[in-house]
Swiss-Prot record:
Gene Ontology molecular function: any one: metal ion binding
Protein function: Non-hemorrhagic metalloproteinase that hydrolyzes the alpha chains of fibrinogen and fibrin but has no activity on beta- and gamma-chains. Cleaves X-Leu bonds. Inhibits platelet aggregation induced by the von Willebrand factor (VWF) (IC(50) is 1.4 uM) and type I collagen (IC(50) is 3.2 uM). Acts by cleaving the vWF and its receptor GPIb, and by cleaving the collagen-binding Alpha-2A domain of the collagen receptor alpha-2/beta-1 integrin (ITGA2/ITGB1). Also degrades the extracellular matrix protein fibronectin (FN1), but has no effect on laminin and type I collagen.
Domain Peptidase M12B: start-end pairs: 6-200
Necessary cofactors: Zn(2+)
Protein name: Zinc metalloproteinase barnettlysin-1
Length: 202
């Protein structure tokens, strides 16, 4: 049944700029990440997906990839790094890079679509675009949604009168609900592609 629970083991990397922004305190950065992942759990409950934080790596000395304003290049480099280097890191299904770099144009996050469990492409890059953890967490929800095969909502999609997570435009109202379309697209992807890595929780 589609309702069979799925588990996304999430690995988060905090880049050097974001580490410095958080007053170079690793504890502060880690606490913020835990908060954001708890917010993500709420949204994903509706999709019958549990988000498990399996690791946080903080690039406290220097960035291990070239983090640049061109989001597609940064996403590509991060994917290469994950496939090559992070194998050493704990087993995980999906990795997100949080950066203080201001991406070109209105972009605040970028992810491959329908790439969950792919060694290189099960990744996303997220700009730490707000002082409000909640707003950044919604962007994390949104990009992970793309990895799970969810596209942007169109006019006919709804999530009960609230702003929806997969809306193409960022809303300053907090969107913590996935739309009916998102639900269908996510489970279409899971049933068709059957990404194996999200069946277990370790």
């Amino acid at each position: 049944t589609p309702e069979q629970q799925r588990y996304v083991e999430l690995f988060i990397v905090v880049d050097h700029g974001m580490f410095m922004k958080x007053x170079x305190x690793x504890x502060x950065x880690x606490x913020x990440i835990h908060q954001m992942v708890n917010i993500m759990k709420e949204a994903y409950r509706y999709l019958y997906i549990d988000i498990l934080l399996t690791g946080v790596e903080i690039w406290s000395n220097k960035d291990l990839i070239n983090v640049q304003p061109a989001a597609p290049q940064t996403l590509d480099s991060f994917g290469e790094w994950r496939x090559x280097x992070x194998x050493x890191x704990k087993s995980h299904d999906n990795a997100q890079l949080l950066t203080s770099t201001d991406f070109d144009g209105p972009t605040i996050g970028l992810a491959y679509v329908g790439s969950m469990c792919d060694p290189k492409r099960s990744t996303a890059v997220i700009q730490d675009h707000s002082e409000i953890d909640l707003l950044v967490a919604v962007t994390m929800d949104h990009e992970l949604g793309h990895n799970l095969g969810i596209r942007h909502d169109t006019g006919s999609c709804s999530c009960g009168g609230y702003p929806c997570v997969m809306s193409p435009v960022i809303s300053h109202d907090i969107s913590k609900y996935f739309s009916d379309c998102s639900y269908i697209q996510c489970w279409d992807f899971i049933m068709k592609e059957n990404p194996q890595c999200i069946l277990n929780k370790r």
